[in-house]
Each structure stands twice: as structure tokens, then as C-alpha cells.
């Protein structure tokens, strides 16, 4: 068992809140969760007050930087934001004064916290639901605490830092009877859902091969960083002990915060964990993929501190009902300075057909082939290869795609709708 998991499993009895250290964080996290932060306690579900359809929920937002800024502003359009929590005081200052179009300054009267344990201590009874948008290593700790207090949770992707954590959250959510969702914005796109329906309708025939790639990492990791960064002074606006949370203790370095923690094993999940949930979302949902029967991987610049500089991973999935076995290939990073991509022959075939797609059908985010230029593969996307055709998505989120060969699908008509749509995009 790794040191990281051991620290997350540890339970204590005393709770010294006033002066927060990392050790105190673990102690108090365990107590708030019940018998232990990772063990689902036996008391019945905490009942929430009955609310009418017109009554607004009281929501607390844990993490308000980056994606958390958008999540908190979005939820403020539909609920009362009663508390905001972040380890970065500069973010809190900006959020308290922020104006959201159409609703003014929804955060100016919200409770302000650096430590979500204290937030739950002081406002727990007035909180109905929580958004959690923090570094990966803290997803499970914050989410489990909220669940065990009977709060509904919206946790950003990836759901957790490892598989074991995800399984524990699933058990806790089921026992507590709360509503939960992982933030994965592409899933709400109408075009994404139509793509799922296209594949499941059989329009492409049986799918036996999928290729998914990303230009990530776009943050520093191997080969640039392959050992522990040296200690640096902690900025006065950053609460470093709270940022570390349940991770193994280490000194601060600007290499971690903000955003760049993704490439460190103790905090992030690398390119696959960061973008796989987006770029692989369409094929995984459409093909109803579960557990793979085998996984093969190769990667470069391996080390114990940071994620690899590049990788290729092949998953083999068994048949699912009438769907045949399928091989899913993942590509990330740069090898010898070149982005790792699907096989050249497949790429050439896809781009040749993509060039035939009428110009006005191409999305602004995709690379439109000019008359005198050869089209290039987008930096991220997916290719779903079926017996009757292919779906090419030059897009991170699967919300843009084209059916190839272009001539074969010239008169394309959408299949019957089987998935709900969100016309407002909320």
C-alpha cells in the first residue's frame, strides 16, 4: 500500500481546528466523515427539508479557480451560493466581488472559507449541495465528507485520484441516498448525444476499433521535471497545508499551483486522467464499455515523481450484448518532439475523406482544409472505425464530429432521439 493511500485511510479522535496543519487536516477529515473518512458509517440517510420545485437550493462551492470559477458562476444562476471555499485568498477576493451577468454579485454575502472542514462545521445544516472543483488528490476527501453529511455533490472530473477511491464514493452515495454527478461538460452537448445515437443506431455498422489522442500534457512534467522540486517560500495568499490536504507532505514550489499539479503523481492523473474522460467519452458511452479484458501500455521518461512525456495505451474490451469486442487506442504527449498520433495510414484515410466535407459544415474549432492546403489532424480528437463508415471528431469533448466517407453520408439524417437534450446548455 502506498504512503498516499495510508494517509487517506488514517482515522483519529482529536480535532484541533484553530491552527490547521496537514496532520490536523487528516484528523478532522476522518472525524467529520464518521467512524473514518473512508468507511461508510451505518446511521440512516440524513433527510433534507422538503422543497418545492420553485425553491432554490443552498449550495457551497469548494474550489473557485479555473473550472471552479465557471462552475460556481453557473450554479449561482440556479441556486443560493451560501459559501465559497478556496485555499487561494486571491481567488476568494476576486470571487466575492465578481458580477455574474443577469444576477449581479451572487457571492458578496456568501461565507468565505479556506478550509472546507470549518465550512461544514459552521454552515453544514444550511447547505443542501456542494460543488467540488479542486486538484484531483482532494476530490475523494471533499466528496466523501459531503456525502457522509448528507449533501448532494457535483464533483469535477476525474471523479477521483484512483479507482479504489471511486468505488468507496459509489458505496457511500448509494447508502446515503444522495444525488451525485461528475462534471464532464461535453456530455451535455446536443451534438455529443446525437453522436452516441448515431453509433448505437448501427449507422457505422459494428465498431471494432477506436483511436483517441490528445496534445496533453500542456503543463510541465517529464522530461522537464523528473525529480522533487526544491522548497520555495509559500506565497502569503496561499494556504499550503490545506492545498496538500491528504497528500504526502512536501514543501511548496511554484511548480504545483495553480493548474500545473496535473503532471505530479501525488496530485494529478496525467494526460489520460485529465483528458481521457473528455476525449474518450463519446466512444465509451456509445459503445457501452465497461471493464477491459486486457491493457497494454508503453511510455517515455518514466519516473516516480511525474507522469510520462508520452504514452500509447491499448485497451481490449469483450463483447457487450450484440456489440462485438473492440480495441480502444489512446495516444498522448510528444515522442522525439512529435505528437503521438494514430497510425499514419488511418490518419491519411481520415483526412482524405475529411477534405471532401463541404466547407460550411466544418466547425470553427476544427482545422478547415483550404483549397491549396492538405488538411491536418487536430491536436486532439477521436476516430471511431465501423464496418460501414467512420466517425471523426476533431474535438476535445465530442461535440463536433463528421461521418466519413463524406459522399456516403452526404444525405445524413439524424437517427431517432434516445437521449434527453438540454436546450439551454446549463
Predicted feature descriptions by range:
Residues 58-62, 82-86, 131-132, 154-155, ...:
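Structural recognition of the beta-strand scaffold that forms the well-ordered cores
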Residues 2-152, 167-179:
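N-terminal glycine-/serine-/threonine-rich beta1-alpha1-beta2 phosphate-ribose binding loop
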Residues 194, 206, 211-217, 221-269, ...:
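Contiguous beta-strand/loop segments that form the cofactor/metal-binding neighborhood of enzyme cores
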Residues 91, 107, 133-137, 157-164, ...:
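Alpha-helix capping and helix-loop boundary segments enriched in small/acidic/polar residues
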Residues 152-154, 159-237:
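A contiguous active-site-proximal alpha/beta segment in oxidoreductase catalytic domains
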Residues 70-75, 94-97, 140-145, 165-166, ...:
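Short, solvent-exposed loop/turn and secondary-structure capping segments
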Residues 52-54, 76, 106, 123-125, ...:
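Extracellular/periplasmic catalytic domains that process cell-envelope and extracellular macromolecules
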Amino acid at each position: 500500500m502506498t504512503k498516499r493511500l495510508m494517509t487517506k485511510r488514517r482515522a483519529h479522535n482529536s480535532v484541533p481546528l484553530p491552527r490547521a496543519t496537514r496532520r490536523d487536516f487528516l484528523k478532522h477529515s476522518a472525524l467529520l466523515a464518521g467512524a473514518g473518512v473512508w468507511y461508510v458509517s451505518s446511521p440512516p440517510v440524513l433527510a433534507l427539508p422538503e422543497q418545492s420545485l420553485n425553491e432554490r437550493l443552498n449550495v457551497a462551492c469548494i474550489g473557485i479557480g479555473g473550472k471552479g470559477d465557471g462552475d460556481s458562476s453557473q450554479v449561482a444562476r440556479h441556486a443560493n451560493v451560501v459559501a465559497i471555499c478556496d485555499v487561494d485568498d486571491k481567488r476568494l477576493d476576486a470571487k466575492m466581488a465578481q458580477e455574474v451577468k443577469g444576477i449581479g454579485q451572487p457571492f458578496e454575502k456568501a461565507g468565505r472559507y479556506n478550509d472546507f472542514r470549518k465550512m461544514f462545521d459552521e454552515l453544514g445544516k444550511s447547505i443542501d449541495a456542494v460543488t467540488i472543483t479542486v486538484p484531483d488528490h482532494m476530490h475523494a476527501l471533499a466528496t466523501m465528507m459531503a456525502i457522509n453529511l448528507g449533501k448532494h455533490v457535483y464533483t469535477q472530473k476525474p471523479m477521483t485520484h484512483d479507482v479504489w477511491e471511486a468505488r468507496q464514493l459509489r458505496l457511500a452515495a448509494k447508502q446515503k441516498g444522495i444525488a451525485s454527478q461528475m462534471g464532464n461538460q461535453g456530455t451535455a452537448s446536443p451534438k455529443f448525444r446525437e453522436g452516441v445515437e448515431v453509433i448505437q443506431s448501427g449507422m457505422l455498422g459494428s465498431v471494432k476499433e477506436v483511436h483517441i489522442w490528445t496534445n496533453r500534457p500542456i503543463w510541465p512534467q517529464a522530461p522537464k521535471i523528473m525529480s522533487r522540486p526544491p522548497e520555495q517560500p509559500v506565497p502569503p495568499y496561499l494556504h499550503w497545508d490545506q492545498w496538500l490536504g491528504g497528500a504526502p507532505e512536501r514543501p511548496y514550489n511554484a511548480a504545483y499551483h495553480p493548474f500545473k499539479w496535473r503532471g505530479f503523481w501525488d496530485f494529478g492523473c496525467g494526460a489520460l486522467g485529465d483528458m481521457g474522460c473528455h476525449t474518450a467519452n463519446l466512444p465509451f458511452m456509445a459503445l457501452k464499455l465497461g471493464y477491459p479484458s486486457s491493457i497494454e501500455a508503453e511510455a517515455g521518461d518514466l519516473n516516480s515523481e511525474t507522469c510520462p512525456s508520452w504514452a500509447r495505451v491499448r485497451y481490449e474490451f469483450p463483447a457487450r450484448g450484440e456489440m462485438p469486442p473492440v480495441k480502444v487506442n489512446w495516444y498522448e504527449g510528444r515522442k522525439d518532439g512529435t505528437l503521438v498520433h494514430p497510425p499514419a495510414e488511418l490518419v491519411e484515410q481520415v483526412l482524405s475523406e475529411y477534405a471532401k466535407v463541404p466547407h460550411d459544415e466544418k466547425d470553427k474549432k476544427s482545422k478547415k482544409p483550404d483549397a491549396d492546403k492538405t488538411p491536418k489532424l487536430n491536436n486532439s480528437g477521436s476516430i471511431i472505425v465501423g464496418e460501414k463508415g467512420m466517425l471523426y471528431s476533431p474535438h476535445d469533448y465530442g461535440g463536433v464530429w463528421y461521418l466519413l466517407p463524406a459522399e456516403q453520408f452526404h444525405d445524413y439524417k439524424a437517427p431517432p432521439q434516445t437521449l434527453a437534450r438540454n436546450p439551454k446548455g446549463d
